Amino acid sequence: MRDKNTSHNNSQKERIHEIPDLDIIDLENDDLESSFHSSQEESSLPSPSPKEAAGRKKGILSRINIHIVLLAVFLLSIVGIVYKIKTWGVFIDLDEIFKDGPGDYSDTFDVILPLTNADGQPVYLDYGEGTSILMFGNAPLADDRDSEDNLANMIQEMTGATVYNCSVSGSYLAALSPTLNPEEYPMDVFNFYWLCVLAMADNIDDSFRRGVEVLGEDAPAEAMDVFHTLKNVDLNTVDIITVMYDASDYLAGHEMYSDQNATDIVQFTGNLEAGIELIQQKYPNIRIIVLSPTYAYGINEKGEYVSSDIQRYGWDVLSTYVIKQYASCASRSVTFVDNLYGTINEDNADDYLVDHLHLNVKGRKKVAERFVYALNYFQDSGNTSSTEGSR
């Protein structure tokens, strides 16, 4: 017993004096401090729930899907644009289109009106042989004046009428000055309005002569012939007055129209309306037929022919001049023959012009035929009567 107790006590003493294993920590070690804090932070952060983890994964996939969709739309747009460019329209052979010629314009600004009486009622007359026609204008009527190929002479031949050709080469429809001033603007004495005044009164005879004197050698060769014709013709015997000026006003950049003053003579349409107004007031039994300019080419800075629907000279394109002239004639109830779209147009101009402006013989004949068409438009109506009875 004693021995057992003795051995038991000895073993307890051994355990009491047994020194455990210890780790020595260096408190000045920075790595240890950082690892300690990081471990604390990791342990303090809550771990994501399974739902949150699934949501994050779904959000990433959604963003990826949107980008893919946008990329696909962009690529499809590019493909569509390329396809449209390559397949735009249908290639057409112009030679095939015009193999039978350029065709005819079916839409024109023609306004064919009969003469009207004091009550505004139409008077249909038969303009056959014995009809008297007085013509104003410039190159279309003045070129080759003494030739059978002259436009006025062609009309005389086609109608059997007596034609007084008072056109003046190199003249314009629009005046350069609102008042007659032969010293500074001598060519103004030849425009339509002042020629009408010359034919109806004696108060500008001296101004006309002075204009011719100022021009000297540059005066139109027919100037004094026109003067004497207008002073001697009896307007009471005239049945038709015809007015035709070419595109010279457009090419010179002359003013076109005025909304404030319809009879402003420095305007292309105003000068025409002023002359028409004068005729209708003093000679209401005269039918007025206005022939528009035919097509003419514009000329660019290089001297090249260009479309007159593109080239402007201060105001507008040629077609606008013609359309404004049509509106003026409609407002005055006079006949308007649209030569720009109905006679000589951009498609066939090369066949009827000798240059960018002047008519060849075929062109004059075509214009003459259009005039005769307008002159006799109402002849088959059954209501026509002799021009002698209308005077």
Question: For each predicted feature, which ranges?
Answer:
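N-terminal secretory targeting modules
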Residues: 2-164, 378-391
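Surface-exposed acidic, glycine-flexible loop patches that form ligand/cofactor-binding
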Residues: 124-125, 221-236, 280-282, 377-384
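Structural recognition of the beta-strand scaffold that forms the well-ordered cores
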Residues: 132-137, 162-167, 239-244, 287-292, ...
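Second-shell loop/turn segments in exported
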Residues: 139-143, 256-266, 311-315, 352-359
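Conserved SGNH/GDSL esterase-like catalytic core that processes O-acyl groups on lipids
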Residues: 142-254
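Generic structural signal for well-ordered alpha-helices
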Residues: 272-276, 322
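Catalytic His-Asp segment of secreted/periplasmic serine-dependent ester chemistry enzymes
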Residues: 293-391
